[in-house]
Amino acid sequence: MSEDNSQGREYTLEADSELRFEIEQKNAKVLVTLLTGFAELFGTELVKKKKYEFGVGAKVAIFTYQGCVIHVSGQMDVCYISKETPMVQYINCHAALEQFRLEAEQRDKRGPSVLIVGPMDVGKSTLCRILLNYAVRVGRRPLYADLDVGQGAISVAGNVATILIERPASIEDGFAKTAPLVYHFGHKSPSGNSVLYNAVVSKMAEVTLQSLDANKRTKSSGIIVNTCGWVKGSGYEHLLHAARAYRARAIFVLDQERLYNDLLRDVPANVHVVLLPKSGGVVERSKGLRHESREQRIKEYFYGNARTPFYPFSFEVKFQDLRLYKIGAPPLPDSCMPIGMKAEDNKKKVVAVTATPALLHHILTLSFAESTDDDVIGTNIAGFCCVTEVDMERQSVMLLSPQPRPLPPNALLLWSELQFMDNHA
Ligand code: ATP
């Protein structure tokens, strides 16, 4: 039931407790002000007397280590104080990572690569945010890698991305997503093309581990890696692959003892596997809600948000000018492959896509690769377009794009399974 709190109310939080709230109603707005004491939102400190605004979809917890008084006004669907939080365990994990970082600093070695794993909706992205915030607050500059192609915390879903974290996440907007390294995958689950997923993860790990060496501070700070919530069968194999690719020093397992035991058995003994509880505040999302939040991220990519609106452009591209490809050809038995090639290689093959009405609403990734002879899988991407119309008579498509100009002459576009219905009037 929704709680109308338009007059506002003060909440007094004891040490080690948190105020949790959710906003589900459209156009609802909640204002939060820290009046006294110290408080943080997923690791970012609140500034006293500053008003923070949250809108629909917000599911947050304001935690305090010392105790505080917060003023909250607006319409919320859920709002309560909880004294049961795993924050002390989380800060202990941060302290352990700091030990690794100090060690790395002294020996001029790479800092820890840490994988955050667990089933869906256990707070993996939130734990990444907390650990990254704590790291920057003590002067570190870690990398944040997001391998969760189902949601896309850095880029949009269907891609694997890494950013350098230089300052704490904004309370309202999360981490600044400037200059990310993004590799195209094109599916919303690794099962869409397992071979390609592992290849993209390997490439991302190789490039980012190397990039650590370019800056002394980042080198000792290490990488925090967010992973997919698919932890059974092939999903588990993908986690093991990621742990190897990133040369993980530690794996933090949220909530699932079975996964923890499997990892203890399967990773080398020098990798620290730690089981952590999930927070009771983490909100479970239905399939529909996951779909919605994926769409919301894509919408934000094109249209921004209420605080920073963007105004995308639409332009026509003739079929003949559309250099559209897809990664992964249909499987063939090994016996039908050219000599020296395996059926697996087909899964990483770049194949041309013919324009048909089936392209409608699909997201197309604009690659920095100039031709299919380049390493398309391992080339950063420039951005995304969305097909808003396919006109078979005019032999053209309309593309929605953040860029005003038509596509660069040699633009290479990659087909993605992701779709976005542009009904932003
Ligand atoms: P996925 O399986 O999609 O990758 P996840 O395991 O990464 O999910 P999160 O995205 O971290 O889970 O958390 C799910 C939702 O719960 C988010 O909207 C987050 O803001 C919210 N959440 C996390 N921790 C808390 C908390 N302590 N109190 C209230 N809400 C929370």
Swiss-Prot record:
One of its GO terms (biological process) is mRNA 3'-end processing. The keyword Nucleus applies. InterPro entries: Clp1 (IPR028606), Clp1/Grc3 (IPR045116), Clp1_C (IPR010655), Clp1_C_sf (IPR038238), Clp1_N (IPR032324), Clp1_N_sf (IPR038239), CLP1_P (IPR032319), P-loop_NTPase (IPR027417). Gene3D superfamilies: Clp1, DNA binding domain, P-loop containing nucleotide triphosphate hydrolases, Pre-mRNA cleavage complex subunit Clp1, C-terminal domain. The keyword Ribosomal protein does not apply. It comes from the Eukaryota. ATP binds at E18, K59, D121, V122, G123, K124, S125, T126. It is found in: Nucleus. Disulfide bonds: none annotated. GO terms for molecular function: ATP binding; polynucleotide 5'-hydroxyl-kinase activity. Keywords: ATP-binding, mRNA processing, Nucleotide-binding, Nucleus. GO terms for cellular component: mRNA cleavage factor complex; tRNA-intron endonuclease complex. Belongs to the Clp1 family. Clp1 subfamily. Required for endonucleolytic cleavage during polyadenylation-dependent pre-mRNA 3'-end formation. This is Protein CLP1 homolog. The gene is cbc.
